[in-house]
Amino acid sequence: MDDAAVLRKKGYIVGINLGKGSYAKVKSAYSERLKFNVAVKIIDRKKTPTDFVERFLPREMDILATVNHRSIIKTYEIFETSDGRIYIVMELGVQGDLLEFIKCRGALHEDVARKMFRQLSSAVKYCHDLDVVHRDLKCENLLLDKDFNIKLSDFGFSKRCLRDGSGRIVLSKTFCGSAAYAAPEVLQGIPYQPKVYDIWSLGVILYIMVCGSMPYDDSDIKKMLRIQKEHRVDFPRSKNLTGECKDLIYRILQPDVNRRLHIDEILSHSWLQPPKPKAMSSASFKREGEGKYRADCKLDTRPGSRPEHRPDHKLATKPQQRMLVTPENEDRMEDRLAETSRAKDHHISGAEVEKAST
């Protein structure tokens, strides 16, 4: 029985294909029970690596069934067929993902970015308070609802933190995520605090929101890592970012894990606080290189409204591929950094983690 027939029996009328990842495909569908459209993630156990099926998939399904937050994609139903196909029925991000939005729209005005980033940070705090880490925070995994609110999705690399006898979180040794959003310690293959890793990814996302470009060029992992370890963050002058915004990004993209901000410190940062009421004319206001915005900061989603200035590091035209190095295969790392770094949208292997750390 094909996917459409399986879903039809469950009360879902299949629509269009929304995307395809390494181990799954996503389709839209209309739920006769819920009376609205949903997204259905379909995973075939037979076509999925054993390590993913045995370790990551159970974690993802467990966490999806647990989390409940307004800025996290809702999961309505999970079921499996006798032949090993898993169907995860979720909330549909009707406005697409944040990456596509920014590629179309350009850098966001700080007021808009503040609202979205506060929503994302709130979702991450909710997860961290439950000792759940995402480990693949990136713009492609941030979906937008009809009102352009952030919805965190794709918990494929998520896990529940383990604690030792003293209550301290056990360091993670599975180096996963997407290279452009990965923290320096992860790229170096150093056992890491998973919550602190999530924080770094938040900094990359915020930079993309307000600059419309990547903070680092990930076409050369070794060079990128060197710049990150020097705590260099360059901001385009054309964006005229406020000092508070740049301060928050700079403090999040801190290579020293002991000095990197925690999620509560991010949420209490001055830039994220609601702006004080002030008189404002009804006329649109303008910021150099950003175009015109309505006084109430509504988002203009029309294609072609890119900012005047081109980004220093262009946003990827393809989704960022994930990296995954598990403890079991660390001893089989080979030196392939030079050849893989030449690929524009490459998969980070164990070799890259090992070489980047030297």
From Swiss-Prot:
Q: Which organism is it from?
A: Mus musculus
GO terms in the biological process aspect are:
peptidyl-serine phosphorylation; protein autophosphorylation; protein phosphorylation; spermatid development
**UniProt protein name:** Testis-specific serine/threonine-protein kinase 2
A Pfam family the protein falls into: Pkinase
A GO CC term assigned to this protein in UniProt = cytoplasm
Reactions this protein catalyses: L-seryl-[protein] + ATP = O-phospho-L-seryl-[protein] + ADP + H(+); L-threonyl-[protein] + ATP = O-phospho-L-threonyl-[protein] + ADP + H(+)
- Please describe what this protein does: Testis-specific serine/threonine-protein kinase required during spermatid development. Phosphorylates 'Ser-281' of TSKS and SPAG16. Involved in the late stages of spermatogenesis, during the reconstruction of the cytoplasm. During spermatogenesis, required for the transformation of a ring-shaped structure around the base of the flagellum originating from the chromatoid body.
**SUPFAM superfamilies from the entry?**
Protein kinase-like (PK-like) (SSF56112)
Question: How would you summarize its activity regulation?
Answer: Activated by phosphorylation on Thr-174, potentially by autophosphorylation.
Which Enzyme Commission number(s) are listed?
Answer: 2.7.11.1
